[in-house]
């Protein structure tokens, strides 16, 4: 599989071939993904919740994102690597936003993702001007859950719906190469997808986007809580628990280690 680029994303929009994205936060997971046909790996700030144990993503730092991006990049996957810009790494001013985006690229990402709508237009333009591809993110933006009044579906009112449409158009104009739409009503995501020339990526926004993204812990059945819009394709939590319990039993009953697991000195 050859390296996926942002041009491939745009092409898939025109050919109506769905784009597939999963999060990954470490080398072994990225190595497994590298042997699949997945289009893109998102090193998401969701690592704060599913890896570091925080209640939300607000405590994730640039140091965290750089470290995990490096780990994923060391697997040398052909998938497009997109790294999230964490909370307060791009909102303060465009100069620091460009610098932090550059640090993620130096860590191995092929593009960055940031949250927000039209208010991020100048920031997106500055990062793109610096030569760094940007993926946008609208709808439920987890870094802004306090302002949104919690984790909820966005677009219930006409005002919210109109703002989502405006945000998507402004971000496209600013130069994003694709747009994540999270936890909005399905008809809104469909409208946005039809209006934009860039690909849209849904998470909890229905089937009409140009692609889908999931947190890999949800897909593998590892999460403590799985959102209604996610699907678990396997229950690894149960498989891992069973393996650990079997190991305990084997050790206590002298069934591990067996002869093939150690060496004896020849007499």
UniProtKB/Swiss-Prot annotation:
The gene is panB. It is an enzyme of class 2 (transferase). It comes from the Archaea. Its cofactor is Mg(2+). Belongs to the PanB family. This is 3-methyl-2-oxobutanoate hydroxymethyltransferase. One of its GO terms (biological process) is pantothenate biosynthetic process. It is found in: Cytoplasm. It comes from Saccharolobus islandicus (strain M.14.25 / Kamchatka #1) (Sulfolobus islandicus). GO terms for molecular function: 3-methyl-2-oxobutanoate hydroxymethyltransferase activity; magnesium ion binding. Homodecamer; pentamer of dimers. 3-methyl-2-oxobutanoate binds at residues 45-46, 84, 113. Keywords: Coenzyme A biosynthesis, Cytoplasm, Magnesium, Metal-binding, Transferase.
